[in-house]
């Protein structure tokens, strides 16, 4: 809840008056709340800098204070429930929109000068709400200046692609380049980029299963053989179905076969009756 203000704390200046419907109201401490239909469409005359007081209807009383700020006498006014735009905000938004639409410097100068005037008037008339209006005007100025000046765009640097083990080994096989044969038993499996010497070793196993242990015929060769077979058949009631798989599917099948071979028992077939064969 808002703290109560004693009447002794309110010390208005002699020129301070409250005018409502062309009648001067005594400032002994009164709050005007009106929501009648008769006040719709009527305007309230103001003198000097004006500020709206909290009300629930369309007709809002006006307070005229030439020199004394309103923030020292009363609490900040609540926002209008009908959502009507304030005079300062409407003037600042109109000036900001005009500055963003125009491209010439003269119109931008007019916008900045108009914004400064609205800031000073809101500071004298509304007291505490002057900072909000000035901040909104400053934000509008930053947006207009940022949109007008665009800096040069930097080109993206092209990164060197990583070395592919499979491509390098295939190129060396095509060129019949001899691979080095290590004298000792070496590791198998994953090959890092820094270990370039491991990529050029003469091995029968594939490095990280990237190279299959057998040669896969190309699609052109398979189609050529299928067409030749169809020509030699010379029948109309038969056909040849070509089934092909992807490289990653072939590699997965090779891994599955190797795992299956590793779980098989390598003992001789005629086992003694006293031995028991373990389950794989």
From Swiss-Prot:
InterPro entries: Herpes_IE2_3. Residues 47-67, 90-101, 132-147 have a biased composition (Low complexity). Activates the E1.7 promoter. This activation is augmented by the IE1 protein. It down-regulates the transcription of genes under the control of the major IE promoter. The keyword Flavoprotein does not apply. Residues 36-164 are annotated as: Disordered. This is 30 kDa immediate-early protein 2. It holds the Pfam family Herpes_IE2_3. GO terms for biological process: regulation of DNA-templated transcription. Keywords: Early protein.
């Amino acid at each position: 809840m808002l703290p109560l203000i004693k009447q002794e704390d309110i010390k208005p200046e002699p020129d301070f008056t409250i005018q409502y419907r062309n009648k001067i109201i005594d400032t002994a401490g009164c709050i005007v709340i009106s929501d009648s239909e008769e006040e719709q469409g009527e305007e309230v005359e103001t003198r000097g800098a004006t500020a709206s007081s909290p009300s629930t209807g369309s007709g809002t009383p006006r307070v005229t204070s030439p020199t004394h700020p309103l923030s020292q006498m009363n609490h900040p006014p609540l926002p209008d429930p009908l959502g009507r735009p304030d005079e300062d905000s409407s003037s600042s938004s109109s000036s900001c929109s005009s500055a963003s639409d125009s491209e010439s410097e003269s119109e931008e100068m007019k916008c900045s000068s108009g914004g400064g005037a609205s800031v000073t008037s809101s500071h004298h008339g509304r007291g505490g709400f002057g900072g909000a209006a000035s901040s909104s005007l400053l934000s509008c100025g930053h947006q207009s200046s940022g949109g007008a000046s665009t800096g040069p765009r930097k080109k993206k640097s092209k990164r060197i692609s990583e070395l592919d083990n499979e491509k390098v080994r295939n190129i060396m096989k095509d060129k019949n380049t001899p691979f080095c044969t290590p004298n000792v038993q070496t590791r198998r499996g994953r090959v890092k980029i820094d270990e370039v010497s491991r990529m050029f070793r003469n091995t029968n196993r594939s490095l990280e299963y990237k190279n299959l242990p057998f040669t896969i015929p190309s699609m052109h060769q398979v189609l050529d053989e299928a067409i030749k077979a169809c020509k030699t058949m010379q029948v109309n009631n038969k056909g040849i179905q070509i089934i092909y798989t992807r490289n990653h599917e072939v590699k997965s099948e090779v891994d599955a076969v190797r795992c299956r071979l590793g779980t098989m028992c390598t003992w001789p077939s005629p086992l003694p009756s006293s031995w028991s064969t373990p389950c794989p």
